[in-house]
């Protein structure tokens, strides 16, 4: 919720252009991604605010919208996992464990999986300003630092320090 309000207040002209471009095509993928993130933030807002009857009803209504957009976009992002500034560029399967913690300004591409190794195992903690490329799997209780770029199709099972770039061929390599 806070993302939507802050973004609108700071970038009114950009929002007008975005709505004009994104909503002009009825099957625009950016439209549904934006609607999914909006519904996610409203569900988070109503879960975290006071527990009045109206808030519960509004949360259920937004939860229904979130599930609808989840079926359209194939995103499974639980509430209160991602920080502000979440960016998703394309449709595709994005699955995040409810116990994971993702910092601010994270960019996700399709095929990202953030999970755990065992049913009772821990999930990842991801810092701020992290880019996660298409097809990347983050498995287990790993810690990914701030300002990290992870290339496509990587499998991350070990901690990554701040200000790193990770690329994958046969084995994961940290470049910086």
Question: Where would I find each of the regions flagged by the language model?
Answer:
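Conserved NTPase motor "head" modules and their coupling/switch loops across ABC/AAA+ ATPases, GTPases
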Residues: 74-78
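Left-handed beta-helix
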Residues: 79, 84-85, 89-92, 97-98, ...
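Terminal amphipathic alpha-helical/low-complexity segments used for targeting or macromolecular assembly
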Residues: 1-73
């Amino acid at each position: 919720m806070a993302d939507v309000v802050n973004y609108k207040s700071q970038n009114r002209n950009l929002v007008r252009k975005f709505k004009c471009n994104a909503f002009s095509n009825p099957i625009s993928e950016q439209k549904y991604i934006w609607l999914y993130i909006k519904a996610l933030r409203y569900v988070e807002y109503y879960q975290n605010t006071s527990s009045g009857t109206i808030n519960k009803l509004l949360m259920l209504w937004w939860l229904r919208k979130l599930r609808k957009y989840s079926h359209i976009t194939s995103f499974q992002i639980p509430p209160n996992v991602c920080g502000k500034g979440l960016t998703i560029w394309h449709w595709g399967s994005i699955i995040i464990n409810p116990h994971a913690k993702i910092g601010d300004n994270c960019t996700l591409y399709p095929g990202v999986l953030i999970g755990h190794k065992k049913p009772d195992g821990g999930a990842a903690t991801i810092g701020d300003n992290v880019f996660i490329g298409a097809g990347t799997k983050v498995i287990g209780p790993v810690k990914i630092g701030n300002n990290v770029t992870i290339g496509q199709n990587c499998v991350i099972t070990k901690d990554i320090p701040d200000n790193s770039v990770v690329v994958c061929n046969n084995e994961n390599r940290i470049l910086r």
